[in-house]
């Protein structure tokens, strides 16, 4: 007998739009509505009403209340229309939040969705076309804001123009490379092999955007179609946001699922979750080679489910760049030889901005139903490896459990940041990247450095020759000079 308040995922669907005809291209609202309709059909029941329909914030629509627009198109009468802030952790956070409220008797049916039409929007802008869905609908009532909106960039990072993911995530990988004692070429071969494994999973995934497996050499070698973006990453190692994709999930209480007549073979149980964040700003993180919040949050989610990482047969680690997979594998204690994705990751399965992990969860639900494993684990990440949400899914029911290790994380050491005259002088390179232009040439070097007192400072340089030198050899540990205006002098 399943406890009537047990949360259960009863429906999941994914939508891809590949049309090259802009007249046929549908916007994110239409794609999300198709995903919702598909998730309801996947449940094998008629679901015309829900307590809430919540949308993961999309970068492809400026509609005031996208959830209300999706509900109207999908024919779902929802009591509440929700909208998350930005953050790739949002899909798993939404599942954790809905599961907790279902278990507490506050909710019986939640529809979650997210989607992007970034590819069609980009192509329309390039063609000078103004598609109907590109005009924002401001007529709806304001949505209900859900989740934590977090400022991700320290003012000093903004002032130094260090704000893009491709300017920050590569620095984690450079620090990992130095810590492992690998040369530049050996390290690039290593991460290219990791990404080749992701591409092979995507090639088997019918819902992946790119289903072409790539060799490590194809991924590692810069070229006209695979330029260097942010050293050490070629284009193939970056999340692919140039996609039109949507996904949706339907969660119910067990008693609502029974009342709706949803077959038991559709049920997959979210059994535990955890949500937390690192120190808010990268400037204050103690190290570029560890994610303490992932160490604590993942272990907590697994402990609450009574499982270890080795017990979970299906895993999807967030994968916007190779660094985050390596950091996550080490933090969670996953055997590096294991498959760390069920989709193929953001570079190959597709990176629809904040909503990637909803595709991972939808894929996980399908694989658990098929009997591939009785348990699955999802880690969703937002910001610069900042916000984390973890979920454990099971073929068998269990009481929902959730907790957060945030108090313990907040008590951990943070690194002081110095700027201006306090940063000027000799310093040791801690991590760095070289941002390349569209022509593939070095354009801007960015370094996190440590002062003799152990504080962190930022330094940049736009000399192409210095950028080429930093991309050719190991600079972590070298002594450089920093100027008051954030200049980096070799």
Which functions belong to the PLM regions below?
Residues 361-364:
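Active-site-proximal alpha-helical segments within enzyme catalytic domains
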Residues 1-83, 99-107, 111-243, 247-249, ...:
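Conserved "HGTGT" condensation-loop signature of ketosynthase/thiolase-family condensing enzymes
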Residues 82-90:
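General structural concept
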Residues 89-92, 293, 355-359:
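A glycine-rich, Thr/Ser-enriched phosphate-binding loop motif common to dinucleotide/cofactor-binding enzymes
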Residues 350-357, 368, 373, 377:
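A conserved active-site cap/scaffold subdomain adjacent to cofactor or substrate pockets
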Residues 91-100:
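Conserved phosphate-binding catalytic cores of ATP/NTP-utilizing and phosphoryl-transfer enzymes
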Residues 386:
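Gly/Pro-rich active-site capping loops and adjacent beta-alpha segments
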């Amino acid at each position: 007998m399943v406890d009537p308040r047990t949360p259960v995922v009863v429906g999941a669907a994914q939508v891809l739009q590949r049309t090259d005809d802009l007249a046929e291209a549908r916007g994110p609202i239409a794609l999300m509505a198709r995903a919702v309709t598909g998730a309801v059909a996947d449940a094998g029941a008629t679901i015309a009403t829900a307590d809430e329909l919540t949308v993961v914030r999309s970068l492809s629509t400026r509609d005031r209340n996208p959830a209300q627009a999706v509900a109207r198109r999908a024919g779902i009468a929802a009591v509440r229309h929700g909208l998350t802030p930005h953050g790739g952790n949002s899909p798993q956070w939404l599942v954790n939040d809905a599961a907790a409220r279902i278990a507490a008797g506050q909710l019986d049916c939640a529809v979650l969705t997210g989607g992007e039409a970034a590819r069609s929007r980009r192509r329309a802008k390039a063609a000078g076309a103004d598609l109907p869905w590109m005009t924002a609908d401001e007529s709806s009532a304001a949505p209900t804001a859900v989740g934590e909106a977090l400022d991700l960039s320290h003012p000093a990072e903004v002032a130094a123009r260090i704000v893009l993911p491709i300017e920050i995530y590569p620095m984690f990988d450079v620090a990992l490379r130095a810590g492992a004692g690998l040369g530049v070429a050996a390290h690039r071969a290593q991460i290219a092999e990791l990404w080749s494994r992701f591409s092979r999973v995507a090639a088997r995934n019918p819902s992946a955007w790119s289903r072409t497996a790539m060799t490590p050499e194809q991924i590692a070698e810069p070229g006209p179609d695979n330029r260097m973006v942010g050293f050490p990453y070629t284009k193939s190692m970056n999340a692919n946001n140039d996609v039109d994709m949507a996904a949706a999930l339907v969660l119910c209480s067990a008693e609502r699922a029974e009342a709706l007549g949803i077959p038991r073979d559709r049920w997959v149980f979210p059994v535990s979750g955890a949500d937390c964040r690192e120190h808010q700003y990268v400037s204050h993180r103690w190290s570029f080679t560890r994610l303490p919040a992932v160490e604590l949050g993942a272990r907590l989610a697994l402990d609450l489910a009574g499982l270890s990482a080795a017990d979970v047969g299906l895993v999807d680690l967030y994968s916007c760049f190779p660094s985050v997979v390596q950091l996550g594998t080490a933090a969670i204690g996953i055997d590096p030889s294991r498959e760390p994705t069920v989709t193929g990751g953001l570079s190959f399965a597709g990176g629809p901005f904040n909503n990637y992990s909803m595709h991972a969860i939808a894929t996980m639900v399908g694989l658990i139903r098929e009997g591939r494993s009785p348990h699955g684990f999802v880690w969703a990440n937002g910001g610069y490896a900042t916000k984390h949400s973890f979920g454990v899914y099971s073929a068998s029911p269990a009481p929902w459990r959730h907790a957060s290790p945030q108090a313990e994380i907040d008590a951990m050491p943070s690194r002081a940041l110095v700027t201006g005259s306090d940063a000027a002088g000799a310093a040791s390179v801690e991590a760095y990247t070289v941002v390349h232009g569209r022509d593939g040439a070095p354009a801007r070097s960015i370094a996190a450095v440590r002062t003799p007192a152990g504080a962190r400072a930022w330094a940049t340089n736009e000399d192409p020759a210095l950028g080429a030198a930093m991309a050719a050899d190991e600079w972590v540990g070298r002594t450089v000079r920093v100027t008051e205006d954030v200049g980096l002098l070799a």
